[in-house]
Amino acid sequence: MSSKNLSTNLLATESNLEKLQIDSLALLRWLRPPQASHGLAEYNTPEEIAFAMGISLEKLRFLATSTSLIKHYLPFKISKKTGGERIISAPKPELKAAQRWILENILEKLEIHNAAHGFCKNRSIVTNAKPHIGANVIVNLDLKNFFQSISYNRVKELFCGLGYSEPTATIFGLICTTAEIAINGQINYTASENRHLPQGSPASPAISNLVCRNLDSRLAAIAENIGFCYTRYADDLTFSASEDVSSKISNLIKNTKFIITSEGFTVNDNKTKIADKSMQQEVTGVIVNTKLNISKKTLKAFRATLYQIEQEGLSGKTWGKSTNLIAAITGFANYVAMIHPNKGAEFKSSVERIKQKYGNSQTDEVRF
């Protein structure tokens, strides 16, 4: 179902009929809470979704069908470490609340692959790095344009695979994706078919992990088959082996690229790295040669970032892959404290001053 047809269907419902249906739905859910597959609550119609979110049908239609004249996102750019800029699309409060509702009521209830360590509870860059400590060789690969590679159709298929109806999967897919186009230097958001996960939505990281379950399963299997360990943190893929497997590295990379391409992603060849134990081995910025450690370069960059934030504010600043800057710097400061207590204490003090000065969150959130 296209966004245009969905909009027409949603508009066709009169307000008085909407009230009647919502009252009926309330009674129905009290008598028989429906279940989709995976133990998830079932939402078969736009009316049921709107009721569950606690918003009107008209509001749901507004959030699901955006055009260049109705912007649901606030775009801003951040600098990449390798040069250039990355567009972050931060959803406005109402859309962000809808995305967070989907995250908390659906996405977080599902299991991801054990190899995935990014954007999930009880896993971090630390748990992602630990399996690779003391490895004989480490191979790092990077997925190019990770979120942009996950299209609306893939997101919709994810929800269909969870047992949701076509109309429901369409609505969830539209709420969780967007299409960015530049007109005269301005970023506009359209209802085109070329939609993808926005980098900035609270639902995007969880969706990416769920979409990547098959990718992770295939890569973990091929890695194990030739004596490698595999983990993934967002778009960073790491393979390591404790034995001398130098003769198998080219075969690993070749087969890995084939799987990645067949799963709809692309390897960024410029970021492929191979490091044996005579070199400094890093996994998502963590040194793992003999124990977990942090490079002086990374510590210096983090100290500079905290200073800039404290002096200039949150706008335009970033740390790591998270779009929640406060959460990112808090997490990294805590991580440093685990390895270097004195430096960590210094960083944590800086973070607390930043929180007192600018607040604990970057944007106000509306929760349904």
Residue ranges, per PLM feature:
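Right-hand nucleic-acid polymerase module
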Residues: 1-78, 85-87, 91-111, 115-137, ...
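Short beta-strand
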Residues: 229-233
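Active-site-proximal polar cores
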Residues: 204
